[in-house]
Amino acid sequence: MKIEVSIGEILDKISILEIKKNKIKDKEKLKNINNEFNTLVESYPSYIDQLEYKDLLKINSLLWDIEDRLRLKEKNKKFDEEFIRLARDVYFTNDKRSVIKKKINIRLGSDLIEEKSYEDYS
C-alpha cells in the first residue's frame, strides 16, 4: 500500500532513518532500516542536499539524544529537575521541527501541508 504524504514528512522520515542507520547496530533491524531508507531516497534524491533537510537531520539528532537521556532517567527512576527539563525539551524541539517541515512544504510546493495547533506556552 502506498499513501501520499507531504514532502516535509518524507524528508523528516528519511532524516530519522539516516540517524537510525548510524545509531542502531542490530543487523536485522538495519536490513529493514536500509531498505526503507533506500526506497525513500530513490524517490526523493534531489531533496537530500537541501539545507532544510540538514536542519531536519540536526533537530532529529537532537531529539534522539534527548529521548535517550530521558529513557535513561526513566530506567533509573530519576525524576529530577533534569528529567523535567528534558521532557520539556521534547516538545520545544518538536515545535521547531514542525516549523522546518512546514517551510519545506511551502518552499517545495507540496500539495499536502501538515498543520499543528497547541496551547501557547510562551
Language-model region placement:
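Extended, charge-rich alpha-helical interface modules
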Residues: M1-S122
